[in-house]
């Protein structure tokens, strides 16, 4: 797992799931909202801004995120693959020092919630948000009608502060999860690393193989991948949970006595 700059020290992070959220409203909640797929450099700028502001004010830093990704519900045919599973995102949030995460189940019904109702029902009634950290191009709510201008106008009426964070760019374009997906899929891993701010990470579960590598004196670990975005077939230098010994990874098709399988 690539190293990230964290909000030091790492605290215990509470995780809330479902529409109900926290039973008791958090103290002086400083909130940021997003999917945060990949938890890349631009995401970390938002998340760390929430952590630091909450600590300065003696409040609670909270990330509101969604599962599944809204794109899977709104346009399942064209939905983009995920850079990392939810549990990996939560691990990154914990390293960054967030006090809490609220995972909202994104459904077709939830997608019909207006931007104004999201502010009133989620941010104010449930969280009693005092400050909301957002990117300059942040949009939300049904038909993406909520933007920075609407947020500011509504927040002014509700007594909530909106803190816009300047867009982070690399190579003349905004850093985004979609750019990183494209880089990994095309094998441009050095560029993906620059956008992520850390080494690209793949997630999988070791599964039994045929044992031919072990019989040849070169034991291998076969992975059933949990990552949806994979690099092209090839041989890559890898690290496994920061082990010091060098590793190599083959991504491709493995010949089998009765056919082939992807590895």
Regions found by a protein language model. Give the residues of each.
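Classical nucleotidyltransferase
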Residues: 109-219
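A glycine-rich helix N-cap at a beta->alpha junction
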Residues: 85-101
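Glycine-rich, highly charged phosphate/nucleotide-binding loops
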Residues: 81-89, 113-119
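Phosphate/ribose-recognition catalytic cores of enzymes acting on nucleotide-derived substrates
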Residues: 209-263
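Positively charged, low-complexity intrinsically disordered leader regions
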Residues: 2-30
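N-terminal catalytic cores of NTP/NDP-binding nucleotidyl/phosphoryl-transfer enzymes
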Residues: 22-85
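Residue-level signal for inorganic ion chemistry
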Residues: 40, 93, 132, 192, ...
